[in-house]
Amino acid sequence: MSEVVTSAANPVVKRMRMLASRKIRQREGVSLAEGIQPVWQAVEAGAPVEALIFAPDLLRYQPAVEMVLEAERRGVRVVRLSGELFQRLSDRDGAAGLAAIVGQRLTPLRELPAEPGTTFVALHEIASPGNLGTVIRTADAAGARAVILVGATADPYDPAAIKASMGAIFSVPVARAAGSDEFFAWADERDLAVVTTSARAEQSVWEARYPDPLVVLMGSEGPGLPDADLRRGRLQVSIPMTGTAESLNLAVATGVVLYEVVRQRRARGQD
């Protein structure tokens, strides 16, 4: 068993701090996941774990302790930190005492298969890592095949995105499209129907009949999708607002559309 690290000068501790930088994450192709659920998901999904970091005096959840020890027996590097040092490094109050340095895995867009019954989620220039992570978690829950990031989008491996995804980032394939032209060319080549949301749409999310296979394209909460992208989509739907709110959070809106797609497919006996 390795000794407990107490010094901030330790190379692993320095590396954890450096991974707060998007530039360094992208250069080295690794990210930092913190928390029991994200780390557990990374290990279960077979993500390339460079190191597991845990504080023996903070990590109280015994199944997680056993998972760490089992990974160590399999040859995964395990670094033990003092609780005080882990707390100083943590971005959250009441740190659970578990983190991991994990390799990033982006799937080339051309490798995503579009089979019958497939649903994708595409996000156009989403700036918030938290929103991005929550949508990835929602896509995972609704059975989407992959999430496609279109244009200048937040880093899916930002610690805030990993945290919001609850580790789904390690299970759901994520691909990038440089811009709308590349995205629509990919969708057209695979005969994927692009579904968008707009308050001006003639059909509500419940009235529309969804094509198969499809990709749900969502814009950022502020400006939404560019008009040109709305026009290029095959189907526009609205999400009726019956209260005083004018709009929904991005992840909630995405979930409403995805689960209506799931409901209709099940009603048709496709799932």
Name every feature range the model reports, one short phrase each.
Residues 1-91:
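N-terminal positively charged helical leader segments and presequences
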Residues 5, 31, 124-125, 150-151, ...:
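Glycine- and other small-residue-rich loops at beta-strand/loop junctions that grip anionic moieties
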Residues 22-23, 113-121, 232-241:
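Glycine/charged-rich beta-loop-alpha catalytic/anionic-binding loops adjacent to active sites
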Residues 37, 44, 70-73, 79, ...:
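RNA substrate-binding interface of SAM-dependent RNA methyltransferases
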Residues 100, 138-142, 156-169, 227-271:
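Structured adenosyl-cofactor binding patch, chiefly the S-adenosyl-L-methionine
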Residues 195-245, 249:
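Active-site/ligand-binding-proximal alpha/beta "capping" segment
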